[in-house]
């Protein structure tokens, strides 16, 4: 009987101890809720560790990705601002260039008027030798002179005198009449001689590229200086049929263009 009572007491003591230690463990876990629990690492098929959502390395990787994504956006904004400034600058430059071109065009027209008026005092020869053509006369005077009747009379006279120079182009070699122009050139003041030589050199430079008839009309190439340039090149002396025929075609096309202008 005593033995049973002793065993019962030992059972109660052991049960009380187990309850006490269990309560202490629970209290300890409640006091330290922020203690980090061991992580269960995961690995992929290639042996590379898979980062968890709350892994510090995973967080740093996401932060780097956000930074890398923000950089192109910032660069794009900078490029847009730079493009806007470039557009404003180009518009300003375009307006400035248009103003400069307009001023130069008006200045060139005024200079042409003074030049033609000065040359007309020395006779039609001086004007023709300097590269003035009926098309030049009609274009410049027709746009700027108020007295259209006076312009019409002067233009018709100049045009008639000009194209008479080519009436014998099919019958007589132009080289036979070139000496006349050389003699007339020597009679001019040195300033007009210089102007005439510049005009002739300009035509000779254009002819080196073998332009079409239409291109020469657009450039207002003087048929007289064209003929003089061929003579200087020896085209008439060696009877260069192709070059001479092209000159004839140009004179006809130029006259037709002047009539229609």
Curated annotation (Swiss-Prot):
Superkingdom of the organism of origin: Eukaryota
Main location: secreted
Keyword terms, alphabetized: Host cell membrane, Host membrane, Membrane, Secreted, Signal, Virulence
Subcellular localization: Secreted; Host cell membrane
Transmembrane residue ranges: none
Motif RxLR-dEER per UniProt: ranges: 49-64
Role noted for this protein: Secreted effector that completely suppresses the host cell death induced by cell death-inducing proteins.
Name of the protein described by the UniProt record: Secreted RxLR effector protein 154
Species for this entry: Plasmopara viticola
Primary gene name: RXLR154
